[in-house]
């Protein structure tokens, strides 16, 4: 926590700061977020993790997971904080996109690692899956779709 905090203090114009999150077995769960438009013109928001083939480094990213993310309080508040109407997920991606559109940079720090127990704590019920899909379909995607072409390009340029 101190390393994330001290790094954020010395940087200007930071939206969020995140780090490498690994599962208890050591496999990478999170190494920054990506936001893409797929071949079906659908918004795809993913965590760079075990499927990511690029070399990890400290770099600007589309966003960071709120499982372990730092942001300045004034930046958080002035950008509306988390949208609490999300029921299962996606509010961190939404906030990170708002930071990019406001001119902030989101940073992933690869030299800092934490263990993330998401797979042990997130329910796998059909109800949770429904809430996840609902939040994406009726909250995040419509918000993204209404952005201007240049704002969409700003968000998509970090992949």
List the predicted regions and their residue ranges.
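A recurrent flexible, glycine/aromatic-enriched loop bordering the glycosyltransferase active site
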Residues: 28, 36-74
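Active-site rim elements
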Residues: 58-60, 82-86, 120-128
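Active-site-adjacent helix/loop segment of glycosyltransferases
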Residues: 7, 22-25, 93, 97-159
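Donor nucleotide-sugar recognition loop
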Residues: 61-115
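Active-site lining segments that contact anionic ligands and/or coordinate catalytic metals
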Residues: 14, 66, 121
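Conserved donor NDP-sugar-binding/catalytic core segment of glycosyltransferases
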Residues: 1-38
